[in-house]
């Protein structure tokens, strides 16, 4: 799909991830999706909102197989997005962070050819976006820690550096959860494995 925007061509590329099923399994097994919010993740979104001074901060896990992103933690969303704690990928910039496994820096989303047709702009009010990947213990990107502003803005180097550090802490939290899960599974009696 192509859209003309201020003498620029805006195209949308589909997200494709060869590890989608494996990652979806990790997300479910570690209770990172379809599970209640947790202070272990909420503290990171609070830090992002306070120190980067944005109205919206998310820990978002992307599930291509289910065509959605799930918000393990969020600050600042309202309405149906806050209640459901998820959006379809048509409303996700975090999917690109996961796909490319690197930070995504958007200063003015409606004018950025990489994302200008994404429905997060019109339906969620996203204008500026800074997302950094979060990873499982094997280094696979699972989603993003992101800062969202409803106004165009120039992200400072300190914003990006801080987000990279905080995303690493989110990844550490996921690794701790995975280690605990492995420990619990290894100590289960054999009878608990039977259907």
PLM region spans:
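Regulatory sensory and allosteric helical modules in signal-transduction proteins
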Residues: 56, 62-70, 79-127
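Glycine-biased flexible loop/turn sites that connect beta-strands or occur in inter-domain linkers
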Residues: 139-140
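Intrinsically disordered, low-complexity terminal regulatory regions
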Residues: 1-86, 166, 176-195
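A short, aliphatic-rich beta-strand micro-motif
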Residues: 127-136
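Short beta-strand-to-loop transition segments that serve as allosteric relay/switch motifs
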Residues: 144-153
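Amphipathic alpha-helical "output/dimerization" segments
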Residues: 155-172
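Localized chelating/binding microdomains
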Residues: 97, 111-112, 159, 168, ...
């Amino acid at each position: 799909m192509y859209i003309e925007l201020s003498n620029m061509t805006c195209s949308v590329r589909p997200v494709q991830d060869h590890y989608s099923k494996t990652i979806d399994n990790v997300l479910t097994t570690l209770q990172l999706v379809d599970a209640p919010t947790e202070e272990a993740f909420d503290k990171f979104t609070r830090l992002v909102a306070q120190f980067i001074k944005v109205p919206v901060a998310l820990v978002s896990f992307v599930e291509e197989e289910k065509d959605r992103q799930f918000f393990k933690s969020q600050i600042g969303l309202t309405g149906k997005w806050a209640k459901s704690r998820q959006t379809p990928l048509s409303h996700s910039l975090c999917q690109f962070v996961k796909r490319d496994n690197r930070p995504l820096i958007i200063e003015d989303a409606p004018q950025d050819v990489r994302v200008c047709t994404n429905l997060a702009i019109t339906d969620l009010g996203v204008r500026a976006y800074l997302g950094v990947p979060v990873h499982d213990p094997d280094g696979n990107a699972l989603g993003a820690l992101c800062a969202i502003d409803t106004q165009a803005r120039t992200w400072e180097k300190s914003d990006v550096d801080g987000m990279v550090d905080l995303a690493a802490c989110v990844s550490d939290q996921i690794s701790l959860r995975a280690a605990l899960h492995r420990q619990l599974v290894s100590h289960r009696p054999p009878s608990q494995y039977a259907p």
